[in-house]
Amino acid sequence: MIFQLPFNTPSKKNSRVTDRRTGRSFPSDDYRKWHKAAVAWLKTHYKIEKIEGQVEIWLTFVHKDKRRKDSDNGTSSIFDLLVDVGILPDDCWTVITDHHVSNRYEKGVSCCTVEIEKADSGGPR
């Protein structure tokens, strides 16, 4: 399964907002807007199929500027999205047995290409 999300992928864990009354933290508005748009994009443009068993994932992030970003933050956001949309049952290590992340810069372009293969299929690479 291969698909592309034409959005900048925000960090879920570094952009949290804390309720001062309760002390609970929540994902930021930017993250929630991205998540809602990404779910809608996937459901509109791709046939969502649940993948059972172990998988390997390749992520390619294209960044619109050269600002510093940690790759693992975007990775976590994408993994959570895959679970929330129903492609994966969980994002734990027993499901995602291996993942590969690459990053590149293209002025003014933000997107993430996601490739998912069953771990026992030999993968696309």
Predicted regions and their residues:
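Catalytic phosphate/metal-binding cores of nucleic-acid and nucleotide-processing enzymes, i.e., regions
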Residues: 1-125
